[in-house]
Amino acid sequence: MAEVLSFMDVKRQKDFELEKNLLKELSLRQIIQSVKDCLEPLFPFLHDERDIITEGCIDFAIEAYLLGGRFGIFGYYGESMQSISARSAREEEELRMEFFDYLYNWIHEQYATFDKNTVYEAARKFIKDWWTAGFVQREKQCKLRMR
């Protein structure tokens, strides 16, 4: 006799497979380099990859990458990146604000001379770059798999 599955279990399993496939293409070195390039001007004390702020930035980069990846299939079906970005704007804004709060809590007056707008713009750019990378990667996976 067949086993009864809930829709939530099936959705969770599909999400797990999607994330696993997306993360296969992601390089930790690429993320660490992105963290250094984007955030080192804000934090001159950010030198060690094992530093706790870098680990937090890696977590946010992965979350943004996976968020973009979840919406990448719509790009395969012909929807523009701008309309898809508008569709995911709420989740992206939540992630951006969490990342901004995380970064702003690390600022000490003796280390950073930037105001909130500079930190917010760095957070916005960082999250948007990783969202776009995830989106492009998922769109590419769909094109390669579905033809």
Swiss-Prot record:
It comes from the Bacteria. InterPro entries: Uncharacterised_YbaK. Pfam families: DUF2521 (PF10730). This is Uncharacterized protein YbaK. It comes from Bacillus subtilis (strain 168).
